[in-house]
Amino acid sequence: MWDSAVTIIAIFLAAILMFVFPLMTMADKSDDVSQLSIQNATTDFTNKIRTTGYLSQDDYDNFILTLASTGNSYDAEITIQKLDQNPAKKSSGDTTTIGQNVYYTMYTTQVLEQLPLSLNEGDIVSVNVENTNTTVAGQLRNFMYKVTGNTSGNIVAQESGIVTKTTAN
């Protein structure tokens, strides 16, 4: 009887070592590739906006298609802080600033409604991307770590920067 119990436990452990851990490793590598792809796409998208000072519907659509190409679903949030400068004319030849420069914020829905959008030098662009589905690696981690209470990580990318060039579009 004791030998049967040990044999069953050994078979169970062998199955875990031979099938579950390699599956978890491959799923984690898939998530790593998705993370790298999403981070690169987010960086490229943000840098294009920063260096051109312009955001078009085609640029946004291409970004969303790149995100979707990983096989996951994502929530992409765009935040643009537009610089509202406050120059005042003191006399005909003298320009001074009265008060402070203020940024006003546009969020994703406002940005998408105003496409194409031209930005000015000094505006701030932020793009945050987070997956909305649970990946295979996340499901396996949740199953394996259910006892310990660990949660699975998300695929997240963040990028921001200041617009350095203004286009005349």
Task: Please place each PLM-identified region on the residue numbering.
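Low-complexity, flexible helical/coil segments
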Residues: 1-5, 79, 161-169
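Alpha-helical assembly-interface signal, strongest on the long, hydrophobic N-terminal helix that forms
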Residues: 2-65
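A sequence-composition feature that detects small, non-aromatic residues
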Residues: 5, 10, 14-15, 27, ...
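Residue-level signal for the start and early helices of compact helical domains
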Residues: 21, 67-69, 154
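Generic intrinsically disordered, low-complexity segments enriched for polar/acidic and small residues
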Residues: 42, 100-104, 142
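Envelope-exposed proteins and targeting segments
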Residues: 121-125
